[in-house]
């Protein structure tokens, strides 16, 4: 009987142990289900947060792109404005150049009598005044005798043979037939020149 009680006690212990194991397994299943639910909820929340963050990143990217485009437009506008201001007197200067040429031609004629001399003095003052106004606005004369011929600045009208090789060099300007003018780095009118050749 003692043995029966022992075996029954062992069975009870075993069944109690089995029940405890089952409870533990069920509890761990419940915990894992709860953990899975929490994980899926947190995954959904994080994916929701990620999906919510993606539009924010998109908007931020669009904002920075728009800001960069605005800065580029502002720089382009400033460059165009500076260019316009730099060359704003170009058309006026081009229209004044023929009058300046005519005044220069008038000065090349010698005045014989005192009345002609006074007229020539007035023409000379007008010429100097116009010439100074052009210089003050960045317009300079180009093309002098002895300068190296540059097709970007000069227009060769004729060739002049070299008489004195020590003083006259091939490819240099022999005579300026009409002065050229330049506004900053832009040629308003090329100089009409004769060039020394062999």
UniProtKB/Swiss-Prot annotation:
Primary localisation category: cytoplasm
Subcellular location(s) of the protein: Cytoplasm
Annotated GO CC locations: cytoplasm
Record bears the keyword Chaperone: yes
Lineage: Bacteria, Bacillati, Bacillota, Bacilli, Lactobacillales
GO MF: adenyl-nucleotide exchange factor activity; protein homodimerization activity; protein-folding chaperone binding; unfolded protein binding
Bias (Low complexity): 40-56
Annotated family: Belongs to the GrpE family.
Composition skew (Basic and acidic residues), residue ranges: 22-39
Taxonomy, superkingdom: Bacteria
Function summary: Participates actively in the response to hyperosmotic and heat shock by preventing the aggregation of stress-denatured proteins, in association with DnaK and GrpE. It is the nucleotide exchange factor for DnaK and may function as a thermosensor. Unfolded proteins bind initially to DnaJ; upon interaction with the DnaJ-bound protein, DnaK hydrolyzes its bound ATP, resulting in the formation of a stable complex. GrpE releases ADP from DnaK; ATP binding to DnaK triggers the release of the substrate protein, thus completing the reaction cycle.
Subunit structure: Homodimer.
InterPro entries to which the protein is assigned, alphabetical: GrpE, GrpE_coiled_coil, GrpE_head
Sequence segments annotated as region (Disordered): 1-56
GO annotation terms (biological process): protein folding
CDD domains according to UniProt: GrpE
Protein name: Protein GrpE
Keywords (A to Z) from UniProt: Chaperone, Cytoplasm, Stress response
């Amino acid at each position: 009987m003692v043995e029966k009680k022992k075996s029954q006690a062992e069975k009870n212990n075993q069944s109690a142990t089995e029940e405890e194991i089952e409870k533990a397994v069920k509890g761990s299943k419940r915990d894992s289900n709860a953990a899975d639910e929490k994980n899926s909820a947190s995954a959904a929340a994080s994916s929701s947060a990620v999906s919510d963050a993606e539009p924010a990143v998109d908007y931020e990217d669009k904002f920075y792109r728009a800001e960069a485009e605005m800065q580029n437009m502002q720089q382009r506008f400033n460059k165009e404005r500076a260019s316009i201001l730099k060359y704003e007197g170009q058309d006026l200067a081009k229209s004044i150049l023929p009058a300046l040429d005519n005044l220069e031609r008038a000065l090349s004629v010698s005045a014989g009598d005192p009345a002609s001399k006074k007229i020539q003095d007035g023409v000379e003052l007008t010429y100097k005044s116009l010439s100074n106004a052009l210089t003050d606005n960045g317009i300079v004369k180009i093309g002098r005798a002895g300068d190296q011929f540059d097709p970007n600045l000069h227009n060769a009208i004729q060739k002049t043979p070299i008489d004195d090789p020590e003083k006259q060099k091939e490819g240099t300007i022999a005579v300026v037939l009409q002065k050229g003018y330049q506004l900053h780095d832009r040629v308003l009118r090329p100089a009409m020149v004769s060039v020394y050749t062999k």
